[in-house]
Amino acid sequence: MKTDKSVFICEICGLKDQPKMPQVIGLDFGTTNSAIAVADAGKEATLAYFSNGSDTTSSFRSILYFPPKDRSSTVKAETKAGPEAINSYLDADSKGRLILSIKSYLGSRLFTSTQINGRYYTLEDLIAIILRRLRTTVIEQFGVSATTVVLGRPVRFAGADTKADETLALNRLRSAADLAGFSEVTFELEPVAAAYQYETQLDHDELVLIGDFGGGTSDFTLAQLGPGRKRTGRNPVVGTSGVAIAGDTFDSRIMMNLVAPKLGLGSHYVSLGKELPVPVWLYSQLSSWHRTFLLKDPKTMAVLREVKNQASEPGKVTALIQIISENLGYALYRAVESTKVELTENEDADFVFAHSSVNIEDTLERWRFESWIQEDIQNIATCVKTLISQHNVNYGDIGSVFLTGGSSFVPYVRRFFAKTFGSHKLKGGEELTTVAKGLALRALENA
């Protein structure tokens, strides 16, 4: 980014001042939540805020809502993003198209475009709507030009199995940013950005392990941080790693183990004289929130109706059909998410889903939930331990462990880090906005 070459005269002292550092932008486009921040020299990064009814929030839900097409009107219904998308969707009694976790598609070649209200949207088009809303807000609130941005990216994109997939994901994200009005884009790893923000809290130099737990991925960075690093401006990164396991994964475990059996998973139906299990893939789609709209495909609905007619427990399959046909997937998602959040503070939580004629209630104990995510935690642990061993770091040399992101609150996650590094080393704060602030601070070093 070019600095402002203008030199102004200080009105008080009458002396020439240094060229003014322009405000720079950091944008964290997340699977579940996004945020955007600005920073200038000598100041902390400042977050943009968004209206949410009578409240404001610095965390912008990465959600799109397309209202149903009104054939009697020539006026195109406005596409909603963030908090407005959720509120509009609920006000419309769940009619229309709600799109969640769209970041999860970046590394997948299976998604190229989708048709909504008679128009085809590419993945880049959809992501650009969210990024454009974030950009517009920061322009309105801070008066910046907002053509240059440091944009966060995970260490490993969800669904990206090869280097070619990673390249595809980055190219798509860059194209979406360009469509949103960002003509100059620099990428930074999200856990590295979190390190820049955590560094503002340090009054000494130390080796830090950063854990960024998003909706789609969990990413880790080893970094040398502190005042000494800031003075020299040297690259703080020792090493990075990541795994495609995070908040959405934990949600899916609740869906598959608690909810899906009440919608027919594990039951049977008769086809051509043979007793067969109800297809598991139906529930796998339902547990991946960003794929639920695929279940409304006419062929899938025909399969469901056939299964229901020959099912051993037709009432359960009927409930699944209602959830799909009445667009109740988001309400089900919120019920699952609410249960997971409640388990961060309590030993058990009541799962309640009561919409239309579908009524599901159960109590979930924390120990059961932890048994479902045990393998996920082990994979996260392996990722962290491999990162440390690859760089020949002694565990005792790590001064602190900074955990950010919504899933950093999950007790099982915290117990692993406390047991491995010591509870006194665990740090946190601003779990949903740390990365955006860090990206803005990183942008200062580019300015």
Question: Predicted segment positions?
Answer:
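Short beta-strand scaffold segments in enzyme catalytic cores
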Residues: 34-38, 62-65, 219-222
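N-terminal phosphate-binding loop and flanking beta/alpha elements of the actin-like ATPase fold
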Residues: 7-56, 86-210, 224-244, 360-391, ...
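Core structural elements
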Residues: 217-218, 296-306, 404-409
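Phosphate-binding glycine-rich/basic clefts of nucleotide- and phosphate-handling proteins
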Residues: 225-355
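P-loop NTPase motor core
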Residues: 63-77, 249, 253, 257-262
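Short, well-ordered loop/turn and helix-capping segments at boundaries between secondary-structure elements
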Residues: 255-260, 264-265, 419, 423, ...
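Short glycine/serine/threonine-rich phosphate/pyrophosphate-binding segments
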Residues: 216-221, 436
